[in-house]
A protein has these predicted regions:
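Polytopic transmembrane helical bundles with strong interfacial aromatic enrichment
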Residues: 8-131
Length: 131
């Protein structure tokens, strides 16, 4: 189903969307704890603590956003998927960059940022009617 603003609403169930958002939130807390405790010395030694923390921040913020979208009926799947893919690429590339210090990974990060921005823009431009 597509609304007047072109926002896709497909068969993604609210339950599936909640599980995905919950998994992303779980991962954010897990990575935050790993960075603060288990990886602390490694990240400090390599000077990549801030990079790791940025990945955790965007991971957690967008997990909450996806959790909110999971309550919409129907779930706006295009926006949901763009934000999800974006945060996986954005935060994932930052986690890998912080661990490996492989600098070309920094060039991948903006692709994830564009995915997240695109998802938010789809929401802003959609003409979803309040029910």
């Amino acid at each position: 189903m597509i609304d007047a603003g072109g926002c896709h609403y497909t068969t993604m169930s609210n339950h599936s969307a909640r599980r995905i958002a919950g998994t992303l939130g779980f991962a954010g807390v897990l990575f935050g704890a790993f960075g603060a405790h288990i990886l602390r010395q490694l990240l400090q030694k390599s000077g990549t603590t801030e990079i790791w923390q940025t990945g955790v921040l965007y991971n957690l913020v967008h997990a909450v956003a996806l959790l909110a979208l999971s309550g919409w009926k129907p779930v706006p799947s295009r926006a949901f998927n763009l934000i999800l893919g974006g945060v996986i690429i954005f935060s994932g590339s930052l986690y890998l960059l912080a661990l490996t210090n492989v600098r070309w990974l920094g060039a991948v990060t903006p692709i994830g940022g564009l995915g997240m921005l695109s998802g938010w823009l789809v929401l802003v431009l959609s003409k979803r009617e309040e029910t």
